[in-house]
A protein has these predicted regions:
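Radical SAM enzyme [4Fe-4S]-AdoMet core and its adjacent flexible, acidic
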Residues: 12, 33, 109, 118-120, ...
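Conserved alpha-helical substructure of the radical SAM core
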Residues: 1-113
């Protein structure tokens, strides 16, 4: 029987996060505080609806779970156990601060396919955008995936702040044997449109 085409959904389950990135739309208010997340019963209801949709479309479900940092979701392991029971594979978009060998192994056993973190420039630039120590923590966390079936991914949100550092950043990502490296377009707030990269600069 031929494998069905995947139906992928990116799912924001929590606002909880260790970082306060300059470009984050969740924490862009003056108080920089936001703790919204979905309770487990709501997640289960949405999941069932998603699975019914996949069945109707004759597609295999795949979830890209994000936040915030999904590892900070209070019942993340209960939720991932449900996904395993339903035979739903998933990827995570998160931070490096709650990863270790045991966490990665647990994620692998529950059906995690990939784990994406961010590098928004070289050390000084990245730490300015995200938080001090984040650059080294991200590179250090990649070691936990060595020998794992989980593929690693690095995403860079490109702005005028970091565009000149992209070539050197590519070398660093290759050196650390990251499986996938991608770019996201910077979405400016009203006060920082000057950081937006022009189409000509992207070329």
């Amino acid at each position: 029987m031929a494998e069905r085409t995947k139906f992928s959904m990116q799912w924001h389950i929590t606002d909880r996060c260790d970082q306060r990135c300059k470009h984050c739309y969740i924490y862009e208010g003056k108080d920089k505080k936001c703790g919204l997340e979905l309770d487990l019963d709501t997640l289960k209801a949405i999941l069932e609806d998603f699975l019914r949709t996949c069945d109707k479309l004759e597609r295999d479900p795949f979830l890209v779970i994000t936040g915030g940092d999904p590892l900070l979701y209070e019942r993340i392991w209960d939720f991932l156990e449900i996904l395993k029971e339903k035979k739903v594979h998933f990827g995570l978009l998160g931070n490096p601060f709650h990863l270790d060998y045991d966490v990665v192994k647990r994620l692998e056993n529950l059906g995690c396919i990939n784990f994406q973190m961010s590098l928004d420039g070289l050390r000084e630039t990245h730490d300015y955008i995200r938080k001090p120590g984040s650059f080294d923590a991200t590179l250090d966390a990649l070691k936990y995936f060595e020998g794992s079936k989980i593929k690693t991914a690095i995403m860079t949100t490109v702005s005028k702040t970091n565009i000149a550092e992209i070539p050197e950043l590519v070398d660093i990502v290759v050196e650390h044997k990251v499986s996938n490296f991608g770019f996201a377009r910077y979405c400016p707030n009203p006060e920082d449109f000057d950081l937006l990269v022009s189409p000509e600069e992207y070329r």
